[in-house]
């Protein structure tokens, strides 16, 4: 059996007082003088037996006491506003939120209510958050007639307004490239062309956005499964689950994904109040976003905002599984193609010339 370990602590013994001697040489035992100090003795005392009088311990210096007091006031000033703020409560609710695919109807109801409160607090606008489900027996597909596109960018402006995209910093789901005749390589396109005098001679224009690929590389690289493809062909993002690693942005060959570096800046009067959780709701800072075929509209039987804004009728949208749809007829009669076909992403966004 091992011997128990006893720790010892070094203590200084108080000075031994000497009796005070009177003028007649007699000693007064009741009065003591500490004018002289003999050599102090040291003793070893176990910690368990240490009963040093706390009154004899040196007090905290005034400077140290003042410093600790100031730091305490400063800490309280920082913590109390956070403790009492509504924003802190909302952030904790968001932190413990489940993935969209794991939420129950009750969970979704609470989450949507939280987002509505956040939007009201941040932008001063009442909004409604909906959750349109993917349609069964539908494969949404986009076709674009490059012979008609004139590069006016009306589609871009309509998309920005409909989908609550940030004005500063500017985010646009659609980019229109001015291309020289004889090439279909987007790398040779000019994104920053002058839009007031279009179309230019010997130029044509290619709008590029999310292709809603059937083999999406962006989905494969997401480490937290915050993006996935739904039954009707739309690739969606759970903005509250996204960690902003930007792997999907690097994997997308069409440069269709955008990162929110700052809190979106949207004028209050320009906010679209009809929002969808996986669609056009205002995205928070630090997450990815992209085109989603206006799922809050298309799943309700409407057309995408960019299509309605196109002045030349170059855009066509519909269900490829419906043999009588406009899209199906284009597939039957036109020579269609996709961008970067060699990558085998299997896009659902097609182009053609007349």
Q: Language-model segments: which ranges?
A:
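Extended, non-catalytic scaffold segments that flank or surround catalytic motifs
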Residues: 10, 47, 61-63, 94-113, ...
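Short Gly/Ser/Thr- and charged-rich N-terminal loops/segments
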Residues: 22-23, 35-42
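C-terminal segment of N-terminal export signals and the immediately downstream linker at the start
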Residues: 23-24, 61-62, 81-139, 342-344, ...
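N-terminal secretory signal peptides and thylakoid transit peptides that target proteins
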Residues: 52-75
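Non-heme iron-sulfur electron-transfer modules
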Residues: 125, 162-200, 228-241, 256-286, ...
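Cysteine-centered iron-sulfur cluster-binding motifs in ferredoxin-type domains/subunits
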Residues: 142-158, 162, 202-225, 236-255, ...
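Long, compositionally biased charged/polar accessory segments in the mid-to-C-terminal portions
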Residues: 296-354
């Amino acid at each position: 059996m091992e011997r128990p370990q006893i720790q010892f602590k070094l203590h200084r013994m108080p000075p031994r007082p000497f009796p005070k001697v009177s003028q007649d040489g007699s000693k007064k035992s009741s009065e003591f003088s500490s004018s002289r100090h003999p050599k102090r003795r040291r003793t070893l005392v176990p910690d368990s037996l240490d009963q040093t009088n706390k009154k004899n311990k040196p007090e905290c210096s005034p400077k140290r006491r003042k410093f600790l007091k100031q730091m305490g006031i400063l800490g309280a000033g920082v913590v109390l506003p956070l403790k009492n703020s509504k924003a802190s409560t909302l952030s904790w609710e968001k932190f413990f939120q489940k993935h969209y695919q794991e939420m129950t109807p009750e969970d979704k109801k609470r989450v949507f209510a939280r987002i509505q409160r956040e939007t009201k607090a941040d932008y001063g606008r009442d909004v409604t958050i909906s959750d349109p489900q993917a349609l069964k027996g539908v494969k949404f597909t986009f076709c674009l007639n490059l012979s008609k596109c004139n590069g006016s960018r009306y589609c871009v402006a309509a998309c920005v307004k409909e989908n609550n995209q940030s004005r500063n910093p500017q985010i646009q789901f659609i980019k229109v490239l001015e291309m020289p005749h004889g090439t279909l390589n987007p790398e040779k396109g000019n994104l920053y062309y002058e839009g007031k005098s279009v179309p230019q001679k010997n130029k044509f224009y290619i709008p590029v956005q999310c292709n809603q690929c059937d083999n999406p590389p962006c989905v494969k690289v997401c480490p937290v499964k915050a993006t996935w493809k739904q039954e009707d062909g739309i690739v969606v993002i759970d903005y509250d689950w996204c960690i902003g690693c930007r792997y999907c942005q690097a994997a997308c060959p069409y440069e269709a994904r955008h990162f929110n570096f700052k809190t979106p800046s949207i004028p209050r009067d320009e906010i679209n109040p009809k929002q969808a959780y996986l669609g056009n709701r205002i995205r928070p800072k630090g997450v990815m976003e992209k085109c989603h075929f206006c799922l809050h509209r298309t799943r309700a039987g409407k057309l995408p905002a960019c299509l309605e804004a196109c002045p030349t009728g170059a855009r066509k949208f519909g269900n490829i599984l419906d043999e009588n749809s406009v899209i199906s007829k284009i597939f039957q009669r036109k020579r269609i193609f996709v961008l970067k076909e060699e990558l085998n992403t299997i896009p659902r966004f097609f182009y053609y010339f007349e």
